[in-house]
Amino acid sequence: MNEQHAQSDRPPTVRPMDFLLVTGLSGAGLQTAAKVLEDLGWYVADNLPPELISRMVDLSLESDSRLERLAVVIDVRSRLFTGDLGWVLTELESKPVHTRVLYLDASDEVLVRRFEQVRRSHPLSGGGAEGTLSEGIAAERDQLAKVKAAADLVIDTSSLAAHQLRQKIEDAFGDAENRTMQVTVQSFGFKYGLPMDADLVCDVRFLPNPHWIPELRPHTGQSEDVRDYVLSQDGAEDYLATYHHLLDLTIAGYRREGKRYMTIAVGCTGGKHRSVAMSEALASRLGKDSGLNVRVVHRDLGRE
């Protein structure tokens, strides 16, 4: 009895905070990585001096809204960063954090081309007055050699486009929910204007309008009677099937490009009957894809 009571008094097990150190060569994609991590739900601190990392971890653990994921981007922009992170990692070993190090690399040729394209000097080249771009890259590579050797994951971005780097980071540091594509199906009425945030717009005004059926007019496309009427019209189901196939192709392309959000606008005259019914039906079809998180929004419902 006493043993059971003692067990019930034990504090619940707290999951260690995920902590990620992001470092690497200037021009290798550190800012892109930071943006991707933010999209994945990480709290990202950029260009933090090494001396403050341990303190920031402590504050993150002590705060009322305890962070679950913290990433710190550190590179040679911080003049206090000499390339030695061993002592930082040692300090973190005593804290309830799961620490990993991500290192981004790229070839000298690619880094030179990237710096020339954006017309910026390398942080270690002295703006061109004290050294060349190639010398700055070489100095940084030498300075970060130990960090690279200690990294849990090294990504060479030489041949990667931004969306390909995003995919690698999502695979390594995201979860199933983060990798799910967010799709919004939005009904609207053309007489109120096109939705400003729509990626795709389809027009279902080719279907007969339930507005002219007295017993259906008061109801919306969410009602069974209106839905059955709209979907029973010639071409309605064929249109849904064809448009769904088109969306499958489009969504696959969005995923390849690293896009995680899509808004599909379905319009009729007033946004009350046809667009509502067709949006619900389209969302139902899309919802069968486990890789999509689908929601329906009826923008103009109730405006009449």
Curated annotation (Swiss-Prot):
Gene3D superfamilies: P-loop containing nucleotide triphosphate hydrolases (3.40.50.300). GTP binds at D75, V76, R77, S78. The keyword Glycosyltransferase does not apply. It comes from the Bacteria. InterPro entries: P-loop_NTPase, RapZ-like, RapZ-like_N, RapZ_C. Pfam families: PapZ_C (PF22740), RapZ-like_N (PF03668). GO terms for molecular function: ATP binding; GTP binding. Belongs to the RapZ-like family. PANTHER family: RNASE ADAPTER PROTEIN RAPZ (PTHR30448:SF0). Displays ATPase and GTPase activities. HAMAP family: RapZ_like. This is Nucleotide-binding protein RHA1_ro07174. It comes from Rhodococcus jostii (strain RHA1).
